[in-house]
């Protein structure tokens, strides 16, 4: 399979730079996986699409203000993007600079350069940085960090993004990108879903900056997926098994929930799914056998991204590309602050040939 098979034309004007005034007021394109049929509506239509007893799976990670600006003590501006917090004093990060800092280099971080840190080691493209400060990494980031808006949102972050680029149920700090399908859920909608009898449970996957890395190979099978930490606790496993047992659906909110659930299923020894607390490098593309997820709520993804490949593996390649073509024609808003899709699983997707 070639990366270019997942390309599509997207006018710049369809990239959303701000969210809708109300979280749940975005548009919703529904794709019936088995038939490919499309339905246009609004996000609150989910209420009619979900049945009592269906299980909604959310990712409760919380975005940290992961972008820092500053300079090397020896001169030279730098930009630091946290990939993950290692402990209370250390981070693993991407560093942009005209010349990469060497181990032992002193860094002055923050818009006022008030925070002192040391680059202690390099691991491939990533740098280990230790803060020389009494406060914890999280306190420092909350104090001097900027919200790490994706590269395609071409504007500086604003104070409002600290709330807008965060799900209302976010709980565990550690992500450097929001699980964006969840941004559309507000408290009134969650309340109505609960009242209808829809079950809810949470995984945690701390989205890394690698989620924005382009696929740099021509052939999909050659791509090496970035690693992210995921947690699928026992209560989540119990909720999945109970939903399946009563004939209800497991509905993943976002590709990060999909990757968490399917990672836990891949690692399971004795049951459909078992608790999972580990790094995952799961790469889902056409031909993948889904084991847990029956339906998916997701935003519109970048051309040639691993995420449009994941959706194609779920709904079928042709159905997915047709849906994206329709979304462009109907002027849906794309990417993190854009509109959403509701997709049901296509069991025939695994047999579909792509690019032939």
From Swiss-Prot:
Instruction: Return the broad EC class.
Output: transferase
Establish whether keyword Heme is in the entry: no
Tell me where on the tree of life, at the top rank, the source sits. Answer: Bacteria
Any Gene Ontology CC annotation: cytoplasm
* Localization annotation: Cytoplasm
- Please, one GO biological process term? tRNA wobble guanine modification
What SUPFAM superfamilies does the entry give? QueA-like
Reaction it catalyzes = 7-aminomethyl-7-carbaguanosine(34) in tRNA + S-adenosyl-L-methionine = epoxyqueuosine(34) in tRNA + adenine + L-methionine + 2 H(+)
Recorded coiled-coil stretches: none
Molecular functions per Gene Ontology: S-adenosylmethionine:tRNA ribosyltransferase-isomerase activity
Q: Cross-referenced Pfam families, in alphabetical order?
A: Queuosine_synth (PF02547)
Write the record's keywords in alphabetical order, separated by commas: Cytoplasm, Queuosine biosynthesis, S-adenosyl-L-methionine, Transferase
> Taking the first listed entry, what is the main subcellular location of this protein, grouped into a coarse class?
cytoplasm
Q: What does the record give as its pathway?
A: tRNA modification; tRNA-queuosine biosynthesis
Function field: Transfers and isomerizes the ribose moiety from AdoMet to the 7-aminomethyl group of 7-deazaguanine (preQ1-tRNA) to give epoxyqueuosine (oQ-tRNA).
The record's similarity note reads: Belongs to the QueA family.
Q: How does it assemble?
A: Monomer.
Q: What is this protein called?
A: S-adenosylmethionine:tRNA ribosyltransferase-isomerase
Species of provenance: Shigella boydii serotype 18 (strain CDC 3083-94 / BS512)
Record lineage: Bacteria, Pseudomonadati, Pseudomonadota, Gammaproteobacteria, Enterobacterales
């Amino acid at each position: 399979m070639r990366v270019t098979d997942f390309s599509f034309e997207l006018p710049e004007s369809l990239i959303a730079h701000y969210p809708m005034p109300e979280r749940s007021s975005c548009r919703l394109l529904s794709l019936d996986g088995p038939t490919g049929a499309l339905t246009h509506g609004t996000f609150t239509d989910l209420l009619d699409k979900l049945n009592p007893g269906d299980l909604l799976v959310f990712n409760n990670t919380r975005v940290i203000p992961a972008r820092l600006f500053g300079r090397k003590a020896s001169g030279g501006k730098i930009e630091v993007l946290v990939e993950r917090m290692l402990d209370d004093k250390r981070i693993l990060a991407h560093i942009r600079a005209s010349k990469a800092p060497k181990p032992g280099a002193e860094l002055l971080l923050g818009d006022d350069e008030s925070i002192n840190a040391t680059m202690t080691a390099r691991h491939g493209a990533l740098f280990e940085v230790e803060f020389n400060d009494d406060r914890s990494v999280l306190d420092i980031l909350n104090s001097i960090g900027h919200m790490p808006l994706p590269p395609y949102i071409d504007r500086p972050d604003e104070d409002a993004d600290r709330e807008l680029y965060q799900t209302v149920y976010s709980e565990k700090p550690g992500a450097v990108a929001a699980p964006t399908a969840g941004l559309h859920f507000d408290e009134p909608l969650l309340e109505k879903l609960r009242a209808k009898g829809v079950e809810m449970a949470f995984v945690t996957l701390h989205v890394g900056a690698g989620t924005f890395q382009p696929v740099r190979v021509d052939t999909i099978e050659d791509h090496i997926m970035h690693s992210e930490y995921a947690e699928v606790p026992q209560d989540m496993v119990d909720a999945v098994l109970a939903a399946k047992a009563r004939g209800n659906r497991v509905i993943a909110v976002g590709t990060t929930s999909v990757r968490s659930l399917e990672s836990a299923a891949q690692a399971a020894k004795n049951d459909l799914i078992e608790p999972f607390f580990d790094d995952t490098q799961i790469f889902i593309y056409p031909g993948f056998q889904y084991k847990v997820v029956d339906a998916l709520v997701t935003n519109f993804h970048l051309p040639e991204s691993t995420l449009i490949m994941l959706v194609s593996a779920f709904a079928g390649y042709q159905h997915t590309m047709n849906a994206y073509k329709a979304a462009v024609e109907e002027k849906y808003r794309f990417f993190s602050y854009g509109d959403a899709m509701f997709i049901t699983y296509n069991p025939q997707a695994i047999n579909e040939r792509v690019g032939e």
